[in-house]
Swiss-Prot record:
This is Olfactory receptor 2A4. It is a multi-pass membrane protein. The keyword Cell cycle does not apply. Disulfide bonds: none annotated. It comes from the Eukaryota. Keywords: Cell membrane, G-protein coupled receptor, Glycoprotein, Membrane, Olfaction, Receptor, Sensory transduction, Transducer, Transmembrane, Transmembrane helix. Glycans are attached at residue 4. The keyword Transmembrane helix applies. It holds the Pfam family 7tm_4. Belongs to the G-protein coupled receptor 1 family.
Length: 310
């Protein structure tokens, strides 16, 4: 047994048990989604950096969300594409651990950034006269750094608990990428502590922040209903709707996967939920956040020269 434990240093990702034609179709489709993700989020970052009118707390946090989405995609999609072209090409032990760590880091950071964005929206709508005094750049930077730091630290805990585990079972991960629960199934030691820490991290990183978001939106809704101007009300509702769509996509899939009974789903269903979470969410987030935002759309028109053409 000891020899087996030390010999397994490479692993195969077997998330796509399909024929060659379907593999090539998925390769083209996922490549397209990957390009759209990079272009969409990259466009948001470019517009925010180019237009001084977008140098506000709301867009500062949106730029961090775009960075997380780009990082999400870059951590998982390239490896998926490699697996589709070369199913027998293994991933190293170090590569597996790094992918698991980064996925967890970006997931936690994204959840916390959405909480921060909810707080920013709460201050903007419920305390508009004090907004600039409350949301100073020092506060914004502190909130963003705290989100990233918390994501890294919580993921380090999982990594520290994962590294000592012996892996003596067949080195086949039946998943699209090295998700922590899929990796734990390969361990030939007791993983109850690891699984309990994943559940505890999911509850603290999902249910707690989501409760904060719900409270914030209850206050926001009360404040919006008291606004006299119908036009201002509609603009506030549009902003809230876009943000809530992103929250629903991110938190909805994550809670179903990690917090429900036995992590919420049969193995295959959970695997495809994770695919949606890591592939489609980063692509959809910039569209949802920006296409309904008039300031971002106007900046894009100016950059593309649409206004001059009209």
């Amino acid at each position: 047994m000891g020899d087996n434990i030390t010999s397994i240093r490479e692993f195969l990702l077997l998330g796509f048990p399909v024929g060659p034609r379907i593999q090539m179709l998925l390769f083209g489709l996922f490549s397209l989604f990957y390009v759209f993700t990079l272009l969409g989020n990259g466009t948001i970052l470019g517009l925010i950096s180019l237009d001084s009118r977008l140098h506000a707390p709301m867009y500062f946090f949106l730029s961090h969300l775009a960075v997380v989405d780009i990082a999400y995609a870059c951590n998982t999609v390239p490896r998926m594409l490699v697996n589709l072209l070369h199913p027998a090409k293994p991933i190293s032990f170090a590569g597996r651990m790094m992918q698991t760590f980064l996925f967890s880091t970006f997931a936690v950071t994204e959840c916390l950034l959405l909480v921060v964005m909810s707080y920013d929206l709460y201050v903007a709508i419920c305390h508009p006269l004090r907004y600039l005094a409350i949301m100073t750049w020092r506060v914004c930077i502190t909130l963003a750094v705290t989100s990233w730091t918390t994501g890294v630290l919580l993921s380090l805990i999982h990594l520290v608990l994962l590294l000592p585990l012996p892996f003596c079972r067949p080195q086949k991960i039946y998943h699209f990428f090295c998700e922590i629960l899929a990796v734990l199934k390969l361990a030939c030691a007791d993983t109850h502590i690891n699984e309990n820490m994943v559940l505890a991290g999911a509850i603290s990183g999902l249910v707690g922040p989501l409760s904060t978001i719900v409270v914030s939106y209850m206050c926001i809704l009360c404040a919006i209903l008291q606004i006299q101007s119908r036009e201002v009300q509609r603009k506030a509702f549009r902003t809230c709707f876009s943000h809530l769509c992103v929250i629903g996509l991110v938190y909805g899939t994550a809670i179903i996967m990690y917090v429900g009974p036995r992590y919420g789903n049969p193995k295959e269903q959970k695997k495809y939920l994770l695919l949606f979470h890591s592939l489609f969410n980063p692509m959809l987030n910039p569209l949802i956040c920006s296409l309904r935002n008039s300031e971002v759309k106007n900046t894009l028109k100016r950059v593309l020269g649409v206004e001059r053409a009209l």
